[in-house]
From Swiss-Prot:
Principal location: mitochondrion
InterPro entries linked to this entry: 2-oxogl_dehyd_N (IPR032106), 2oxoglutarate_DH_E1 (IPR011603), DH_E1 (IPR001017), KGD_C_sf (IPR042179), ODO-1/KGD_C (IPR031717), THDP-binding (IPR029061), Transketolase-like_Pyr-bd (IPR005475)
Lineage start: Eukaryota, Metazoa, Ecdysozoa, Nematoda, Chromadorea
Pfam families membership: 2-oxogl_dehyd_N (PF16078), E1_dh (PF00676), OxoGdeHyase_C (PF16870), Transket_pyr (PF02779)
Protein name, as recorded: 2-oxoglutarate dehydrogenase, mitochondrial
Gene Ontology terms: biological process: generation of precursor metabolites and energy; glycolytic process; protein folding; tricarboxylic acid cycle
Amino acid sequence: MHRASLICRLASPSRINAIRNASSGKSHISASTLVQHRNQSVAAAVKHEPFLNGSSSIYIEQMYEAWLQDPSSVHTSWDAYFRNVEAGAGPGQAFQAPPATAYAGALGVSPAAAQVTTSSAPATRLDTNASVQSISDHLKIQLLIRSYQTRGHNIADLDPLGINSADLDDTIPPELELSFYGLGERDLDREFLLPPTTFISEKKSLTLREILQRLKDIYCTSTGVEYMHLNNLEQQDWIRRRFEAPRVTELSHDQKKVLFKRLIRSTKFEEFLAKKWPSEKRFGLEGCEVLIPAMKQVIDSSSTLGVDSFVIGMPHRGRLNVLANVCRQPLATILSQFSTLEPADEGSGDVKYHLGVCIERLNRQSQKNVKIAVVANPSHLEAVDPVVMGKVRAEAFYAGDEKCDRTMAILLHGDAAFAGQGVVLETFNLDDLPSYTTHGAIHIVVNNQIGFTTDPRSSRSSPYCTDVGRVVGCPIFHVNVDDPEAVMHVCNVAADWRKTFKKDVIVDLVCYRRHGHNELDEPMFTQPLMYQRIKQTKTALEKYQEKILNEGVANEQYVKEELTKYGSILEDAYENAQKVTYVRNRDWLDSPWDDFFKKRDPLKLPSTGIEQENIEQIIGKFSQYPEGFNLHRGLERTLKGRQQMLKDNSLDWACGEALAFGSLLKEGIHVRLSGQDVQRGTFSHRHHVLHDQKVDQKIYNPLNDLSEGQGEYTVCNSSLSEYAVLGFELGYSMVDPNSLVIWEAQFGDFSNTAQCIIDQFISSGQSKWIRQSGLVMLLPHGYEGMGPEHSSARPERFLQMCNEDDEIDLEKIAFEGTFEAQQLHDTNWIVANCTTPANIYHLLRRQVTMPFRKPAVVFSPKSLLRHPMARSPVEDFQSGSNFQRVIPETGAPSQNPPDVKRVVFCTGKVYYDMVAARKHVGKENDVALVRVEQLSPFPYDLVQQECRKYQGAEILWAQEEHKNMGAWSFVQPRINSLLSIDGRATKYAGRLPSSSPATGNKFTHMQEQKEMMSKVFGVPKSKLEGFKA
């Protein structure tokens, strides 16, 4: 109950009834009158019961909720108070003094002054100074406890260097001072009843001194707990119990020994690397060595709770340590990365602190096998976050793990990047979305209180680097790394929280960086005082070693034996690493598909056509909806139109997509289509999810209703994010090659907000990390007068990143047999601009039937979705048909090649513009139009065929994009390498260079179109009067 609502219960019965009746429709009181009555009620109640004013009301609301659940859970005086409120007591009548029994002594009130009636009827108020004071004091204690729960983290001892305050504020919040409540030294030994919203003692009451000490021990030492921003009382109480309950954080001697051994591995590993390779960059973990025990504790606890697959995303710092001591990648394999060895595999490879791995091993605590994958990633901080989440979601999907009980993400962050990178919030925002949730990740922040050389006061505007987590309701646990036992407790709570509530949680390891940004960097230039202190600071291992020796947990001999044992392990691994003669990139696969490549001929491309009966059945289903389903009238016409297209043997783009998806689904292949508005389609062509017009949330997906045993079709509208969602779908595509995963941009122009994923992961992922992906990017593209932000998917950028040489030696290359398959095998990705429904159908099916996986960048159409010429006959989908890399001229010019004056190569929608213009200017016999449907790998063989067919013709490349954009700079050297043997060269016909992708003026757009057509057909612009593309 909100404060005003509760207070209104104290108003006169007539006002209460008026308000109740107004809200239930029994009265005609206007909204303004209702507000006036409410305000009067609040004022009257506060006047007679002053403890309802100010911040006290927040606590009273919580106590009222607790009382509704269990009246005995609150103080007897509050029980009587709430009973009287419920019974309709007016202002000044609800409060009663506490009873003489039970609590009178504790509250310092005489029994005579504390007599109270607890019947349900309103009682006469006993207005004694003692009773008012007792309840006032009681409330002050409750508010004091709440203040520590809310603000205690602000004064916690979090910085292991003792220099900074983790929240960038050295002041003490006034509400944590006794004087704020009118309390002082005189009250320290008075005993107070504990409220139901704390668990600091098993007793019902404590002295103020004891209360203060417990609160400081819990909230103000080496752990700072942020959780009062959660809007769920059950979650708040859950966290309180795990931090406030006495002795809850204590470890056994055996647990302390395990922690000590893990600290040895973490610390001595870095020291060993520093000794052997002092001038090598490795981005070590010195200053936050406790990260390794922390991660292992999260994995131990989560494994015990049922998780058996962990996907880790992390930056470069500490990566080698994680690979060695969390994943248990063989040490010799890691150490060999420091040697200058020849790679055994193709590809560029990557630096050692970017590499991923996938390991399966026994977890000793749970005695279960667990799989741990560290996802390879670039130096672009936080870019890996959504990739990890997508991989987790896919693993859970294929395992039938609907609630991610067995699959979990662990994301590591740096403090500056966590606060600074927008993709962090984009990724957080996916967490509760039905088709993207992974049901909670554990975030661990390596908070070394500096970003390269930037002070945190210059790198964030919020108090903590973790404040982004407050937006989505994460509990946040700040912990000083010099208290490893506190870190272990926090990690246990984090694992338990994720299991219980399936929500994200943040562990903020407040630490330092012992060296510079890397081992060769000099930090004293910019942080002299901090690094003077660091030089004087012992390692966490040294401090914890002293602690366990002082506590008698271990003796000197035990410590020495453990240190010697791990030192020997490192030296043996070093000796073995010297015997390694080459580096195997395949040792660092984060998503291995070993079974997929077995018994597959990498140079054999199966046919992608399907049987006629399948075509009819899929289109039939795609055109129907269930009986009793209230479909929009406009969609009824659309569905009938699909059936008619089948009868007319003329299928449109939506049917081509549906046939690709439906045929794969019937073969048991999982299809996932994701992006903004993909269910309907940005241009309202798809309608894969039908909505009942009368029943909210009632939907029908016809492609999920094709046949029994079919693959699942997931078509999901995404959040308005490109960066995180594309990264998510990339991670999803990495898990199972027997799937079709597609991301569609709302407009291709917007894909550049995901440029980091495109550049660092998709275009180069296989070369760097031997990681294949069949992800498809659909990027709506086409110049239709819609301005610079709704015209171009920037094809020039994607083509520039293709790994294909633009020169070809015709004497050494044979354009036959396996040429097409070899090109596909060798390329880093496929770039296409299809013009027919049949071709997009074949391209999508080919993504799954190929014996390997390659990303595909497809410049998809807008106006062609409904263009009457952009149709395909049924036979183009049938068995024996395949993707056409080049679609040759099939009209009159193809019948008389010697008469052809010009051959115009093009790609995409502009073809249909040129067909219309060719007819308009009467050039249908002497200008041949050839469509290049697949730009990369470039179809040298088929382009050569067309050039040879029209030996005497002039060769042009036409495009609607500006000269410095589009495919021109990509195709020119390639076509010329084919023509050079005949002494010919291709010419350009299109728009002039420009800084802007397109004009926003409709008139200018039409003039540019006519200018382009004038160049294409060699006619004056006057001949194009009246032409409309």
